[in-house]
Every structure is written in structure tokens, then in C-alpha cells.
């Protein structure tokens, strides 16, 4: 027996983009098409496999759909069928595969339970209803799928190239800033990429400068004399970000705390607080980024900015800023390992001594 549906997904045929895009199953006569055995894709393909015996169907026992997509991406496999939800997550990580066509109808993603577990199914259905009603499913969808929607593949390709060519010279500065601030070095790198594409001497028409695009006022606030000094700019920005994060109400949990910190970095803590006030007036949750981002653009609307303390602001900008940083961070976090600070000798000695 199935629980209520969570979200709609469909199986998709993917291929290596260096090859010829098939238009239908007829184009795949004699070709090998892989899929993950004992998964949703396996179930979704049951009828298709029976209707198209001319295709060489190959079930694989791999750890994840991402592992299968990676094999198509590096041309180890010509074709595969994976679910659209897995494609959405992987499309800016693996850049050499593409979707040829839908391999079956859309269906609701749900949990399967033994027929004897009616009580458990009812409990799960009640939980899913509550999650949908309170916005929990929308939050989870935003958390796991929003990063891949915020970036085009050409932009993702440029970032992948610069991870190899530019980032190695900067990485130590981001890691040092993590040691100082506690913020993931890959998040700091994502912010810097959004601000300057890792250009040390970037200068905007509004007067912000350097790799982190710090304003004069912020530079004075954090004691940064030279905004073009890469190491000091990254360190100063990390301290400033941590200060913004610490000023948010303690009850705000992750990952919303980080996304709200990013919005404050872009628009200022005061304007963010105005948006949170509007969020509450609109019966939203001011502690959830998914709700606050809907209120931020209203700061440019006279009907709404008249109701808040600081008035007008270009509230659409932090929404776009956070989305782009999340997209870059998603790629960096998948491509590069976290930084584990080394233990200082004195700390090691203290732990090792009897």
C-alpha cells in the first residue's frame, strides 16, 4: 500500500551530450539503457521495458542515482533512465549529460508499506498532511532543489573551470577565515564568487571594492584599511558575516539562519528586520527564509515600505543574491571537502597528556 504523494516526479532518459540526442525509444533499438535496480526508476520502467524489447535494458546495482548520472556524464554509459528529481539535483554538478525525453508518465513520490501496516500508513498520511499544511514540504523542496534552479549550466561551467584555475590560490585565505569565524570556507568562497568572481581588484560603480565587494562604511566598521588586500578582505567579511549571524534571534535554526545572514549581508540587518516584520503581518514565519524572501521585494512597494521602520529598499536584490550564493555553495560543497582545522600543538599535548 502507498502513502499519500509527496511530490510529482517522472523517469527521464539521459544521454552524454557529446553524442546524438535520441528522440524516441525507436532511436534506441540495439542500444544499452541502464537503470538502477529495485528503485522507483525500475518500477516506472516495467511497462516500457515490456513494450520495447529492442532496447538492451541493463539493471545496475549502484549506491545512488548520482553515481549512475556520473557514468553517463563521463561516457562510461551511453544512456540511462533516472528520476527527474535526481536530474534536477545533478544538472549543475555533472555538466556533460542532458535529458533526451520523458521515459514515462509523472507519478507521485510516496512511501510503500506492507498492506498489514494500515495504522502506520494513516500516521504517515497525517504527518504528510501536517507538513504540507505548515509549509514543511515546501521548506524541504526549497532546501534540496532550489540551489540547482538558481543557476544556468553555462554559469555553472564557468564556476567549475575557476574552481580548478583560480580558487587554489585563494583557498588558504578562505580556510583561515573559517578558522576565525566558524563559517564554512566554501560558503565564504561562494559569497566571494557572487561578489567578484574571485577578482581581487573588482570595483563597482557604487564604490564597493575588492574580492568581497565591501563598502567603505563596512570597511571602517570592521577595521579594514585596504579593501584590495585579498587576505584581509576575506577575513574582514567573514567577521562581519559572523557578527550579522550572531545578531539574529537565537531561536532561528539552520539552514534559515545562514540564508537570513546572507540577506542581511546584501541589504543590511535593518531592512531584513523590516522584511521579517512584514512577513509576520502577512501570517508568515519571520524565522523561515522561504517566507521572508516573499516579503523582501515588497520593500520596494509604497504600500508596504510605508509600514516599516527604514522604508524603501530594493528588496528583490537580496533574494537574487541568496539564490545565487546557494547555487554556488551547492557546487563548491559537492566538489570540495570541508576544512578541518589542525589541532594546535598545545591543544594536542593537553589532550594526549595523562
Regions found by a protein language model. Name each.
Residues 37, 201-225, 230-243, 301, ...:
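Substrate-binding/active-site groove segments that recognize
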Residues 148-198, 231-234, 248-252, 338-341, ...:
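Export/targeting segments at the very N-terminus of extracytoplasmic proteins
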Residues 1, 46-47, 70-105, 273-274, ...:
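A ligand-binding cleft/hinge motif common to bilobed small-molecule-binding domains
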Residues 20, 56-71, 256:
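Short helix-initiation/N-cap motifs at beta->coil->alpha
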Residues 16-42, 86, 105-148, 167-168, ...:
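Extended ligand-binding regions for polar small-molecule ligands
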Residues 2-4, 41-62, 91-94, 157, ...:
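Ligand-binding cleft/hinge of the Venus flytrap
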Residues 123, 259-331:
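Catalytic and substrate-binding regions of cell-wall glycan-acting enzymes that process beta-1,4-linked
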Residues 3-21, 85-128, 151-156, 218, ...:
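Periplasmic-binding protein-like
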